[in-house]
């Protein structure tokens, strides 16, 4: 065991790694668990991984579970992702080729700073969000473009499902089926049931901040803002059925509006059941979704962070959750002067995900693309210095990898459109 600046690193599996790939995975939650499992399944690319988190025992648990089942060498470390010197010390000791950030969005910039100092490629699944402001956008990370270019390293932003696969779907549609895409509707449906009166399928703090914020969409190059849950539609999803869905603000709209030719409107919809919305409204009404600190028994606490502590851990939902997810994009545009529509989507089964990696499908659909994005960079298919959104790269190898690694996609050339 080696200790550096308060960082405990299990060094048992340290080895010379010429012509091998070394990945540092920061985070130990539900999505991180999927990334770790999929990297270990893909040992030809991920020959060595280091799992690092504030709580090293969580990392050690993954190592104990997987080390005898994989050819990937697994190391664990304790690190505070809010502390750039700690991150730098860990990277200098472990010497990763790439850092897969599946920690909190608040920590993106700290991790990017460490990657810059150590010249390590970077992948994340969600854009930066200031902890004290429920507002997420790409401007903070896009500001790193020139520095990453000069350092000769690649930052791949948003390599989850949405953002992530949805951007790849857009690039694929643009490359193969359209001369210009005028309308995109991103539909995120979770038809799963975990049996709890109220729980979130990913980090409760991030999830509740997202769905309680004002909605927005892009129309003719401008943001149009709506009240939370103001715009509702009903859609019949393949293998899930008819669901209520609501327009939300979502980060990929910002980059897709810049990178997809001919865009007139982009919207994002997510399904919610009535029980979830009723509970959320009650929590909002009593102040439990607030991010403003309050005084409690002589201490400052953030109500939403307290709520997160009492809600079920999303990583614990796997064995309870039944049903399927359906996430995809509906496109309208032009090809050879004619109107064209196209729908590409993935259906994922919660129970099948749990059988494979011990996770529900929400974490699975985020973690698999994070591994694939890292693989694209490590194998040179997407290696390009700078800070890039996922739709800026050739979608074909990523689309092939989705089929191989557990997220097969389907196409419909005559879909029902969203009004």
Listing of model-derived features with the role each one plays in the protein:
Residues 70-82:
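Rossmann-fold cofactor-recognition segment
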Residues 24-29:
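Conserved N-terminal Rossmann-fold NAD(P)-binding element of oxidoreductases
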């Amino acid at each position: 065991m080696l200790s550096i600046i308060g960082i405990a690193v299990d060094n048992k599996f340290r080895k010379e790694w010429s012509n091998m790939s070394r990945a540092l995975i920061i985070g130990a939650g539900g999505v991180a668990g999927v990334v770790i499992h999929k990297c270990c399944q893909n040992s030809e690319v991920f020959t060595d991984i280091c799992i690092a988190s504030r709580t090293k025992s969580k990392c050690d648990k993954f190592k104990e579970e997987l080390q005898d089942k994989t050819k990937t060498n697994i190391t664990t470390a304790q690190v505070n992702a809010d502390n750039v010197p700690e991150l730098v010390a860990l990277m200098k000791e472990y010497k990763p080729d790439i850092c897969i950030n599946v920690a909190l969005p608040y920590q993106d910039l700290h991790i990017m700073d460490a990657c810059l100092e150590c010249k390590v490629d970077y992948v994340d699944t969600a854009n930066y969000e200031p902890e004290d402001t429920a507002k997420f956008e790409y401007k903070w990370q896009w500001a790193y473009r020139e520095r990453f270019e000069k350092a000769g390293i690649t930052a791949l932003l948003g390599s989850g499902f949405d953002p992530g696969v949805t951007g790849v779907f857009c690039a694929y549609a643009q490359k193969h089926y359209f001369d210009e895409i005028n309308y995109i509707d991103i539909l995120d449906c979770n038809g799963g049931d975990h049996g709890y009166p109220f729980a979130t399928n990913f980090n409760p703090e991030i999830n509740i901040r997202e769905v309680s914020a004002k909605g927005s969409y892009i129309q003719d190059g401008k943001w149009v803002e709506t009240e939370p849950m103001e715009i509702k539609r009903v859609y019949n999803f393949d293998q899930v059925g008819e669901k209520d869905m609501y327009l939300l603000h979502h980060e990929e709209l910002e980059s897709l509006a810049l990178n997809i030719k001919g865009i007139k409107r982009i919207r994002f919809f997510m399904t919610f059941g009535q029980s979830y919305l009723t509970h959320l409204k009650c929590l909002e009404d009593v102040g439990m979704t607030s991010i403003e600190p309050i005084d409690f028994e002589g201490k400052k606490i953030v109500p939403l962070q307290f709520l997160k502590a009492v809600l079920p851990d999303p990583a614990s939902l796997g064995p309870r959750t039944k049903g399927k997810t359906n996430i995809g994009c509906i496109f309208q545009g032009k090809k050879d002067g004619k109107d064209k529509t196209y729908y590409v989507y993935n259906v994922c089964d919660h129970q099948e995900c749990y059988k494979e990696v011990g996770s529900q499908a929400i974490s699975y659909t985020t973690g698999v693309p994070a591994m694939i994005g890292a693989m694209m960079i490590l194998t040179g298919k997407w290696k390009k210095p700078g800070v890039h959104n996922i739709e800026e790269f050739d979608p074909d190898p990523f689309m092939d990898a989705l089929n191989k690694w557990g997220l097969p996609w389907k196409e419909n050339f005559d879909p029902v459109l969203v009004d």
